[in-house]
Amino acid sequence: MPTLKLFVYAIVIFFVSPFVFGFLSNDPGRNPGRKD
């Protein structure tokens, strides 16, 4: 099932991209978990 594989890839990218962008920016102030 190619569609299922594509769906899984989308989920993985969706969860991994925030960590990748956070690592590339290397800015703890932009962490959405610490708005206060």
Swiss-Prot record:
UniProt keyword annotation of Transmembrane helix present: yes
Transmembrane segments: 4-24
Keyword Transmembrane: yes
Origin superkingdom: Eukaryota
Keywords: Membrane, Photosynthesis, Photosystem II, Plastid, Reaction center, Transmembrane, Transmembrane helix
InterPro entries: PSII_PsbI, PSII_PsbI_sf
One protein family per Pfam: PsbI
Topological category with respect to the lipid bilayer: Single-pass membrane protein
GO cellular component: photosystem II reaction center; plastid membrane; thylakoid membrane
Subcellular location, record wording: Plastid membrane
Family note: Belongs to the PsbI family.
Quaternary context: PSII is composed of 1 copy each of membrane proteins PsbA, PsbB, PsbC, PsbD, PsbE, PsbF, PsbH, PsbI, PsbJ, PsbK, PsbL, PsbM, PsbT, PsbX, PsbY, PsbZ, Psb30/Ycf12, at least 3 peripheral proteins of the oxygen-evolving complex and a large number of cofactors. It forms dimeric complexes.
Protein task: One of the components of the core complex of photosystem II (PSII), required for its stability and/or assembly. PSII is a light-driven water:plastoquinone oxidoreductase that uses light energy to abstract electrons from H(2)O, generating O(2) and a proton gradient subsequently used for ATP formation. It consists of a core antenna complex that captures photons, and an electron transfer chain that converts photonic excitation into a charge separation.
HAMAP family, per the entry: PSII_PsbI
PANTHER family reported in the protein's UniProt record: PHOTOSYSTEM II REACTION CENTER PROTEIN I
Protein name (Swiss-Prot/TrEMBL): Photosystem II reaction center protein I
UniProt organism field: Aneura mirabilis (Parasitic liverwort)
